[in-house]
Regions:
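Active-site glycine-rich loop that binds ribose-phosphate moieties when present
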Residues: 27-47
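Electropositive, gly/pro-rich neighborhoods at or near active sites that engage anionic ligands
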Residues: 1-31
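Short, conserved loop/helix-junction motifs that constitute active-site signature segments
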Residues: 75-81, 121-122
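Short glycine-rich anion-binding loops that position phosphate/pyrophosphate groups of nucleotides
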Residues: 58-62, 90-92, 133
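Structural motif
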Residues: 51-54, 83, 126
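Short, flexible loop segments at boundaries between secondary-structure elements
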Residues: 80-97, 152-154
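C-terminal functional extensions of proteins
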Residues: 97-172
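Charged helix-capping and loop-helix junction motifs
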Residues: 67-74
Length: 172
């Protein structure tokens, strides 16, 4: 993954994240070699066979984005959209960790649960959001995505287990 800074310089994501402490403005993202990337053997079949698919609460641009950019993955998820649930990693307009909120804003996306819903609306029929964002339910649903409100901040293994049970119980 490569980022282009506001100075027009393209650097590797690790350089941006570690050496520069993600403290520069990003104007573009490029996934090097993505045109020749292929899904791992059997992954497309597994997406089609799975009873549900869960998109973790990770950075939609640099963590989930490269996966969706692999030829065939986004299309497979679109085919299964009704069985796909995403969990928002943006809570109260901020990333719980890392530069996701800044990257979203710098690249012209909204750093909010509605922004995440918009990014995933073609591949996910459901978005799980934190209770902090419960007032955003209607905006999420305006993106054509069912909104599920629960505690998504996994501060303990007990809270993580509750979130897991909630998400696994959706769509069944």
């Amino acid at each position: 993954t490569f980022v282009t800074t506001e100075e027009g310089v393209e650097i590797g994501f690790q350089d941006y994240f570690v050496r520069l402490s993600h403290n520069v403005v990003v104007t573009d993202i490029r996934f090097g070699g993505i045109e020749s990337a292929k899904p791992s053997e059997g992954i497309l079949e597994q997406i089609h066979l799975a009873s549900s698919v869960i998109i973790a609460p990770s950075n939609p641009i640099v963590s989930i984005g490269p996966i969706l950019a692999v030829p065939g993955i986004r299309e497979a998820l679109q085919d299964r959209r009704g069985d796909v649930t995403a969990i928002s990693g943006i809570v109260g307009g901020k990333a719980l960790k890392g530069p996701a909120d800044r990257l979203l804003q710098e690249l012209g996306y909204e750093s909010s649960v509605a922004g995440v819903a918009r990014l995933y609306s073609d591949i996910s029929s459901r978005l799980v959001i934190d209770e902090v964002d419960k007032d955003e339910r209607e905006r999420v649903e305006q993106e054509g995505v069912e909104c599920v409100v629960t505690n998504t901040i996994m501060e303990s293994s007990d809270l993580a287990a509750i979130l897991c049970r909630t998400v696994l119980g959706l769509g069944s």
